[in-house]
């Protein structure tokens, strides 16, 4: 990765503008999960300890661009940062004329999405951000796939543009899993639809030794063998793609399934289920998880892996009745000696549910950015940092 790194720069007395992902869930003015704020702390502390004048920026929610809306204000985030850093962090609403800070001070610009032109990567807005700093630090991997003024444009015009520790860590982990993986490399991809993950499956099939599919994706592969899948979620039109992938790489999917006849609007933690061989599913049944044989087989594959990339659950794990497959495979990843990289919202929820965060080598904070990187797409914000580093 040929980008400048914040840790290599002398920041003493410099105005340092850090783009972070502080887009946290807020209910009735209270932050319900501060995971992203906690993740941003090492970068902020590094800049403060280096004697920089630290200015932070982030988006929050989806306000109407160009309009101030109190519910999307970053004030609760600033209050939490003040607590965690033990120093006052003010929210700056009117920053165009510049922000006066002493060395070691920290302030937070108000929600970047209140600024007209943010999403369009507006040049004038990008230059206005750039004028606030001597060094711009991109540290928000979760927004690196968007070319916007606070992620991409500002990096173009800032005197110096570099990657923060969080972004650099993400890129290193992705490179370790995808560019030069220790083998065997196993990719576990779950989720509802083949269509939304087809490019991911394609890209991973070229890198991994074994491609394991779960969830609704597995159902489409089961159907590609000519088997009945009853009421299960699957994509008939993508059966040819499933067959093609099976020819191109070793694909592992359900050989036995957990099924239910309970309509989905009545699902609960104790919904009744049955176990069926993959070729014995009845017309009125719906596949909602791996059967025990499949889960055990996948767990064994994961146990022998040296690199694991995990994106998506094996079943409808939100309900305990349908969660066993996800639980067994998640535990196998946690117990594995492999370098394991996990990403995507549902995956993080599963890691949370089974309390496995400290057993996964690297957990990616970016949903869309994670998938686009896996697909082999260039992330605009990272590409801009590379361009600036080459100057």
Curated annotation (Swiss-Prot):
Q: Which GO terms describe its molecular function?
A: ADP binding; ATP binding; phosphoglycerate kinase activity
Identify one Gene Ontology CC term for this UniProt entry: cytosol
- In the UniProt record, does the keyword Nucleotide-binding occur? yes
Give the reactions, separated by semicolons, that this protein catalyses: (2R)-3-phosphoglycerate + ATP = (2R)-3-phospho-glyceroyl phosphate + ADP
Q: In which pathway does it act?
A: Carbohydrate degradation; glycolysis; pyruvate from D-glyceraldehyde 3-phosphate: step 2/5
Q: Which GO terms describe its biological process?
A: gluconeogenesis; glycolytic process
Which EC class does it fall in?
transferase
Q: Which E.C. number(s) belong to this protein? A: 2.7.2.3
The keyword Manganese is annotated on this UniProt entry: no
InterPro entries in alphabetical order: Phosphoglycerate_kinase, Phosphoglycerate_kinase_CS, Phosphoglycerate_kinase_N, Phosphoglycerate_kinase_sf
Q: Where is this protein primarily located?
A: cytoplasm
Any Pfam family hit: PGK
| Subunit structure, as described in the record | Monomer.
Spell out the PANTHER family in the cross-references. PHOSPHOGLYCERATE KINASE (PTHR11406), PHOSPHOGLYCERATE KINASE 1, CHLOROPLASTIC-RELATED (PTHR11406:SF23)
Q: Which family does it belong to?
A: Belongs to the phosphoglycerate kinase family.
Q: Mind telling me what this protein is named?
A: Phosphoglycerate kinase
User: What species is given as this protein's source?
Assistant: Teredinibacter turnerae (strain ATCC 39867 / T7901)
List the top taxonomic levels of the source: Bacteria, Pseudomonadati, Pseudomonadota, Gammaproteobacteria, Cellvibrionales
């Amino acid at each position: 990765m040929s980008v400048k790194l914040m840790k290599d720069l002398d920041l003493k007395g410099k105005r340092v503008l850090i783009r972070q992902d502080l887009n946290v869930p807020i209910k009735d003015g209270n932050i319900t999960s501060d995971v992203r704020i906690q993740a941003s702390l090492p970068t902020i502390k590094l800049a403060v300890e280096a004697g920089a004048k630290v200015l932070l920026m982030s988006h929050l929610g989806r306000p109407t661009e160009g309009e101030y809306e109190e519910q999307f204000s970053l004030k609760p985030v600033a209050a939490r940062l003040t607590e965690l850093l033990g120093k006052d962090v003010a929210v700056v609403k009117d920053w165009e004329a510049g922000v006066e800070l002493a060395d070691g001070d920290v302030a937070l610009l108000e929600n970047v999405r209140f600024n007209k032109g943010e999403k369009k990567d507006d040049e004038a807005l990008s230059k206005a951000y750039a004028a606030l700093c001597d060094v711009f630090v991109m540290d928000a991997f979760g927004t690196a796939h968007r070319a916007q003024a606070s992620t991409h444009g500002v990096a173009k015009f800032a005197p110096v543009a570099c990657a923060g520790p969080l972004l650099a860590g993400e890129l290193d982990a992705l490179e370790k899993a995808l560019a030069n993986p220790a083998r065997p490399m196993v990719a576990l991809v779950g989720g509802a639809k083949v269509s939304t993950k087809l490019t991911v499956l394609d890209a991973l099939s070229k890198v991994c030794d074994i491609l394991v599919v779960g969830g609704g994706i597995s159902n489409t592969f089961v159907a590609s063998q000519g088997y009945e899948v009853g009421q299960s979620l699957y994509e008939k039109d993508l059966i040819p793609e499933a067959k093609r992938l099976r020819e191109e790489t070793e694909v592992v999917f359900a050989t036995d399934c957990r099924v239910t006849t309970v309509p989905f609007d009545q699902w609960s933690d104790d919904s009744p289920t049955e176990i069926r061989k993959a070729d014995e599913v009845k017309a009125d049944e719906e596949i909602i998880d791996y059967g025990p044989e499949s889960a055990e087989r996948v767990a064994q594959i994961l146990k022998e892996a040296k690199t694991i990339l995990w994106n998506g659950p094996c079943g409808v794990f939100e309900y305990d009745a349908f969660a066993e497959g996800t639980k067994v495979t998640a535990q196998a990843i946690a117990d594995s000696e492999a370098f394991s990289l996990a990403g995507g919202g549902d995956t993080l929820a599963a890691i949370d549910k089974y309390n496995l965060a400290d057993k996964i080598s690297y957990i990616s904070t970016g949903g869309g950015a994670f998938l686009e990187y896996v697909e082999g797409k260039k992330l605009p914000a990272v590409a801009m940092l590379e361009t600036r580093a080459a100057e």
